[in-house]
Amino acid sequence: MFKPGPLYNKRYHIMERLRKVSLETGDVFYNGSNVRGPLGIPFGGLIQLFTKSIYSHATVTLVEEGEYYAIDVSDYGCRKLRIIDWFDNWGVEDFCVVRLKEKKTDDEERFKVAIKKFLDEDPDYDFTFNNPDAYYCTESVKRIYGELGYDLGGSYLIKDIVPRWFYPILQIGSLVTKITSGASLPTNVEISIVGNERKGMLASPLMRKIIAYDGKEFTYFS
């Protein structure tokens, strides 16, 4: 049964604001998330907590014939959704949109080629965050940008993200579940995080914010 999220009744108003800034193919949404990772751990919430950020999810925008689409990778899989529909069941309200500071003349088309290639592959969602044949949200954004030669950074080992006191707890839990179920946390693989303006993809010097929403007010950036 469909359960609308907090943005459902605001979606038309939000779309008006997004059209005001004229979204472009390649723009990236950063928003909060309650997605769960391996072991059922509320990975999105923990990442937001440990990185002191309200964002943990990332999605690339595609513009086709005036319509805005989200190329979203989540536990629902890899999907191309109209952004107005994508808002329907968000569990949170906060988001911002970032854009390349300096775009090359052919970047728009190159983004479209990279996005089409990614959609055609239709990769699975990476529930373990360390499957080389699957993707999670921020990883998909970095993959698409990487196709154009842009490195958004923001990749770290888990031990460099979580507090020192919490890391041993994760290691013990990971070892136990690896023995019992084969699932484990990616302790030896860097994961990509949205983070904040000091650490993470949001700190990339290649990008700039164009709009942000906190659930009540919009902020525009020049």
Specify the residue positions occupied by each region the protein language model found:
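Cysteine-nucleophile amide-bond enzymes
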Residues: M1-S222
